[in-house]
Amino acid sequence: MKESSLNYMRGDCALLATAVGDLSGLPTYGVVDVDDNIQHVFVYDESTDEGIDCRGRMPAGEIKNNIQGEGLSIRKVSIEELQQVFGLNSYSNEEWEEAEEEAAFLV
């Protein structure tokens, strides 16, 4: 497998979360700071109370670990919001395919 230019913990988390959500049907959530800026994006599985991101599945309460920002909280985010903040349409087909492969591994 070739080396990736994507970094799912530093900016490309919305791409991976969208791919995981598409595959699993689970909703997308964000870790937001005190000013409601999205610092990290993940998928939330309500049935197990777990978050899924590039680190794998973990208790939802731990999803904020190692995420920078003041007054972090979690809230549901829309695809439209992620498009506006992270520019999901700017990713190439190759990058989407790479994220979908990673998502399949995580789901």
Name these PLM-found stretches:
Residues M1-V107:
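A structural boundary/capping signal
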